């Protein structure tokens, strides 16, 4: 089997008082499944011995700018010993290529955490929806930050450590800004409100986006558009299954939205043709300009490739989701004032 060596911060009683307990090398040996543990300050001195007589050195290429320099110094120290029989690694590989793909597949423990995070986030959205309607019924002023506060309260009340990302609460026309951040605008009766928010729980993210009537009641036009987007989401969920291509949920979404845009008159069939033409020419793009899903896990846009090599020099989007991989499906539609 392999041998694990950990380099970590040394034990420091004074820093423990300020920052919390750190294990240090000695405690790490007894509490973690490693065979050796050293202070991080001796990494450069220990590195040549760890690299010697290994065929490949794996490390993250792009995450720490100084690490490649330190690795190269260690390799040079080994190369200087080649005349004495030492073997220097002949390959350098990016460990993120392995770790990113490993992170895509969650075990049952991870899935349970993510299910709980999603439950907390769903409760937070419902809380904000109810609060918006209640405040408007009472004749109170409603601002976007009022609903943001309701989200954070629900997250923390149920054990979430943080929001998984900066929450978006956008009322009325503000919802047409995809990455809206002001979080201060008024919310009026008759407005639609978009909330894009999810909590982080035990290191795992959730991500939910919903649009709802601020006063609790859709107008006929709002309901028509909402039902169309909901139908596209249902199509995406139905297409998200083990063995499907990653792009399948997006294609299912686009098909429903494109037909719906023709049906409700957002697109004129006399000008753009049938649904196949709308999709081929991307006429839908003025209302739906982004992809439907993304990986979800320890980060809200989790690592892992969306393409895979199919042959030398070419790539394919035919990424087959496996059991335990998490995809966030999020159809939506942007209708700006005046459209």
Predicted regions and their residues:
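Active-site neighborhoods and metal-handling regions in enzymes and metal-associated proteins
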Residues: 1-339
């Amino acid at each position: 089997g392999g041998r694990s060596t950990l380099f970590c911060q040394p034990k420091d009683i004074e820093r423990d008082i300020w920052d919390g307990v750190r294990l240090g090398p000695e405690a790490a040996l007894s509490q973690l499944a490693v065979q050796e543990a050293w202070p991080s300050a001796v990494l450069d001195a220990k590195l040549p011995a760890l690299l010697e007589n290994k065929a490949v050195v794996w490390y993250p290429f792009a995450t720490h700018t100084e690490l490649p320099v330190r690795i190269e110094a260690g390799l040079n120290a080994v190369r200087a010993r080649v005349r004495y029989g030492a073997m220097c690694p002949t390959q350098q590989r990016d460990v993120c290529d392995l770790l990113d793909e490993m992170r895509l597949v969650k075990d049952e423990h991870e899935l349970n955490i993510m299910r709980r995070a999603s439950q907390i986030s769903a409760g937070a959205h419902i809380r904000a929806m109810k609060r918006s309607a209640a405040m408007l019924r009472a004749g109170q002023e409603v601002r976007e930050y009022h609903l943001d506060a309701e989200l954070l309260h629900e997250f923390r009340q149920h054990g979430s450590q943080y929001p998984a990302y900066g929450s978006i609460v956008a009322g009325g026309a503000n919802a047409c800004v995809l990455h809206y951040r002001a979080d201060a605008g008024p919310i009026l009766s008759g407005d639609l409100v978009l909330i894009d928010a999810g909590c982080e729980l035990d290191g795992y993210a959730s991500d939910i986006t919903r649009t709802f009537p601020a006063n609790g009641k859709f107008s006929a036009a709002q309901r028509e558009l909402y039902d169309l987007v909901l139908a596209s989401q249902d199509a995406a969920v139905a297409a998200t299954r083990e063995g499907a291509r990653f792009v399948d949920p997006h294609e299912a979404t686009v098909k429903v939205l494109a037909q719906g845009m023709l049906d409700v008159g957002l697109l004129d069939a006399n000008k753009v043709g049938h649904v196949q033409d709308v999709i081929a020419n991307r006429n839908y793009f003025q209302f739906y300009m982004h992809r439907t899903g993304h990986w979800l896990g320890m980060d809200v846009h989790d690592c892992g490739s969306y393409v895979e090599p199919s042959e030398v020099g070419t790539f394919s989007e035919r990424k087959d989701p496996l059991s335990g991989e998490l995809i966030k499906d999020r159809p939506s539609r942007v209708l700006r004032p005046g459209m």
